[in-house]
From Swiss-Prot:
Named cofactor requirement(s): Mg(2+)
UniProt keyword list: Hydrolase, Magnesium, Metal-binding
Entry-linked InterPro entries: Cof (IPR000150), HAD-like_sf (IPR036412), HAD-SF_hydro_IIB (IPR006379), HAD_sf (IPR023214)
Binding site for Mg(2+): D9, N11, D212
Binding site for phosphate: S43, A44, K189, N215
Recorded GO CC terms: cytosol
Residue stretches spanning the membrane: none
Pfam families: Hydrolase_3 (PF08282)
Taxonomic source organism: Haemophilus influenzae (strain ATCC 51907 / DSM 11121 / KW20 / Rd)
Keyword Flavoprotein: no
UniProt family annotation: Belongs to the HAD-like hydrolase superfamily. Cof family.
Designated name of the protein: Putative phosphatase HI_0003
UniProt enzyme class: hydrolase
C-alpha cells in the first residue's frame, strides 16, 4: 500500500517522556515532508503548545489542536473550528463545582483560563506546555474549544462517567489517566482526519495514524493503518492494526521507516 498522509498524536506518541522529539524521528518526518507526504500533528494541546514542535519539524503543513476542535493551515489560519455552547459551559461548571480538587482549564484559540491558577494540576500543566494560564474570566470562557479537567485517576474516571451521563451530546474522553477533555461533539481526532482527507485529496486507506490513548481511538479505527504505541493501554492496542515500540523507543520512526523506505 502506498500511504499518502500521516497523522500523529503528541504526548506519549510523537514526544518522548521528556517532551522531546527524538533525532531519529525528526529525520524521518523531514524526509516525508520533502517527498510531499503530509505529516500532521493532531493533539489535545492548544496551538501554542504545538507550535514549537511544528517549527522544529519544518512540516509547513496544517496542525490540529484541541483533539480536532481547531484546525489551522500552514499560515496558522483556522480552516475548521467548533466550540462548546455557552449553555453547556454553565451546566458543566455547576457539576464541576462539586469537585473542588480538580484542575479545570478553558481553552479558546491560543488563550487558556483556569478555574484556579494555584491548583496543583494547573501548575503542572503550565510546566509541561509552557503556555500562560490566566485567571478565570466568565466572558473569555463562555464558549471555549475545550475544557481540560485534571486530577487523580480515580476522580477523573468518576467525573467522566458523570459528564457523559449528563452531556451525551458532547465529546468527552480521557487523553491520559489524569486528563479528561470536554469538547463539541464534532471535535474528535477521527473527525479531523476525515476533514483533512478531503483537504489533502487522499483516501482513507492511504492514511496512517499513530496514537497511545483513548482520545486517539476513533482516529486509529478510521484510517487505513492505525498504529498503537507500545505504551498504550491494552484497549487501544487491541483496536489498532499494528502495535509498535514505545514513545521512548522510537516507535513512530520504526513504522515510518518501514512504510516509507529511502
Amino acid at each position: 500500500m502506498m500511504y499518502k498522509a500521516v497523522f500523529s498524536d503528541f504526548n506519549g506518541t510523537l514526544l518522548t517522556s521528556q517532551h522531546t522529539i527524538s533525532p531519529r524521528t525528526v529525520v524521518v518526518i523531514k524526509r516525508l515532508t520533502a517527498n510531499g507526504i503530509p505529516f500532521v500533528p493532531i493533539s489535545a494541546r492548544s496551538p501554542l503548545g504545538i507550535l514549537p514542535y511544528w517549527k522544529q519539524l519544518e512540516t509547513n503543513n496544517v496542525l490540529v489542536a484541541f483533539s480536532g476542535a481547531l484546525i489551522l493551515n500552514q499560515n496558522l489560519e483556522p480552516i475548521y473550528s467548533v466550540q462548546i455552547e455557552p449553555k453547556d459551559i454553565l451546566e458543566i461548571n455547576t457539576v464541576l463545582a462539586e469537585h473542588p480538587l480538580l484542575g479545570v482549564n478553558y481553552y479558546t484559540n491560543n488563550d487558556c483560563h483556569a478555574r484556579d491558577v494555584e491548583n496543583k494540576w494547573v501548575i503542572y500543566e503550565r510546566s509541561v506546555t509552557k503556555i500562560e494560564i490566566h485567571p478565570f474570566d466568565e466572558v473569555a470562557t463562555r464558549s471555549p474549544h475545550k475544557i481540560q479537567i485534571i486530577g487523580e485517576a480515580e476522580e477523573i474516571i468518576e467525573i467522566e462517567v458523570l459528564l457523559k451521563e449528563k452531556f451525551p451530546h458532547l465529546s468527552i474522553c480521557r487523553s491520559h489517566a489524569n486528563f479528561l477533555e470536554v469538547m463539541h461533539k464534532s471535535a474528535t481526532k477521527g473527525s479531523a482526519v476525515r476533514f483533512l482527507e478531503d483537504y489533502f485529496g487522499v483516501q482513507t486507506n492511504e492514511v496512517i495514524a499513530f496514537g497511545d490513548n483513548f482520545n486517539d481511538l476513533d482516529m486509529l479505527e478510521h484510517v487505513g493503518l492505525g498504529v498503537a504505541m507500545g505504551n498504550a493501554p491494552n484497549e487501544i492496542k487491541q483496536a489498532a492494526n499494528v502495535v509498535t515500540a514505545t514513545n521512548n523507543e522510537d516507535g513512530l520512526a520504526l513504522i515510518l521507516e518501514e512504510k516509507f523506505p529511502e
